[in-house]
Amino acid sequence: MIWTLVLAPILIGLLMYALPRSADVAAKWFGVAVAAGAFGLTLLSANAPDESIRWLQRPFTANFHAGLGGLSFWLVALLTLSTACALASTRIPRQRDFVAQMLLLMGAMTGLFVARDLFVFALFWDLMLIPVFLILIAWTPSKSDASAWRYLIYNLTGGLALLLATAAYGVIEGSTDVLGATLGHGVAAVGPAWGEWIFAGFAIAFLIKTPVWPFHTWMPQTYADLPPAAAAVVSAVQSKGGLYGFIFVTAPLLPDQMHAAAPLMYVLGLVGLIYGALVALVQDDAKKVVAYSSLSHLGLILLAAFSGNQVALGGAAVYIIAHGLFSAGIFIVLGQVESREETRMISRLGGLGARNPRLAGSLTIVALAALGLPGLCGFAGEILILTGLYQSGAVWVAGIALVPIVLAAAYMLRLFQGIMQGPDAADLPERADASPLELLAVAPLVVAIVLLGVDPRPVSDARSVAAPAPVSAVSER
């Protein structure tokens, strides 16, 4: 059942190219149905046993081993839900091709999060780059493909580093089928001579993917050039691949190297936190406000990942899902604004709230979650991370991290006020308010934002990431 979540979207995405180009509307809603069905299947697979198919025996053992325990379950649920919501809201030329690429992306990212073999993890890591690159090439609003190639070169560099580190680990240990072990148990430790090099390969890949300052320069223009539906999914889920890798791969496999790298990662995380918040404050492009705010938010999760504190790790799990929910919601609403007003520049917008109260209501909830309002999901993750950092003895880190968290209120309120409040923009025609279908596209994310804010325990308890599960059809190593 778990491999069905991976293979079905990929196969359906490829088969969609057999549909006539005139079937754009049907393709859109078929894509929504596939993503919604995958979300339902994910919920039904919460306690499914691991699945493993024997594969390589030389130069090391590698198996198609998949599991859906711990944080993997919540990330796949976030992925399928955000994809369904994003596709339901999309308005784009050549929707058949776009939906096909989005389903390919969903399948590849699902493969990444369910992989319990490190080599399979690395393969899906590179596979998920292809749909995003093709979307950037085909639908970028600019005349240049620079952002597409920058995205590909940066992330392929990280993917190559990950693949080399994975191959080295496999040759040294004899197997890459190691990610299914319970966190901290049953995993062979790599010697210090090779451990630092392998950790460096993993870290380069994960820092680029997240991204973390100063490896972030591919991200702002990529988010700006992606169609809103694609930006919603990439920001919500693909950016979590690096953080998931630190928690799920390096923490159990290379604990000594994780501990040794913590001071450096604290510095990178704090710089990203502050830099992202300050740059978000002065952006005129609404999508770049969200991009730089993501750089800040993800820096906070990086601090938690290297704290070694269970409360902070629980907060990291919550904030990974929380950021996915509100960032997807913001990009979807900004897409609805841009489709009406034909601009996303804050300086050219204003007064939309009075004319579009339903649209304003949607933006209000997701923006309040992003700035950390108590009772919504963002606050739950932040408070757990800060508490855990304090408990771990990193008091100075927690203290500095408070500053950009406060700045989040400033840039999110500026975003909301610039778009929804103030005098009407004189050169913008009056448009209809959000339709019931557009509200329905955001509603599941809003419900999840509230539920996670009220009770974050189901997600925070998933900090073990690789929950132990029986394996069906386990191959002999």
Q: Predicted segment positions?
A:
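Alpha-helical transmembrane segments and their helix-start/interface "positive-inside/aromatic belt" motifs
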Residues: 24-35, 146-156, 356-360, 436-441
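Alpha-helical transmembrane segments
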Residues: 10, 31-40, 80-81, 103-107, ...
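N-terminal signal-anchor/start-transfer transmembrane helix
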Residues: 4-24, 204, 211, 433
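Cytoplasmic/organellar membrane-interface segments at the starts of transmembrane helices
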Residues: 175, 182, 226, 356-358, ...
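Hydrophobic transmembrane alpha-helices and their helix-loop junctions in integral membrane proteins
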Residues: 85-91, 96, 107-119, 131-418
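Hydrophobic alpha-helical membrane-insertion segments
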Residues: 32-46, 155-166, 366-369, 445-454
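Transmembrane helix-loop-helix hairpins at membrane boundaries of multipass inner-membrane proteins
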Residues: 1, 12-100, 175-184
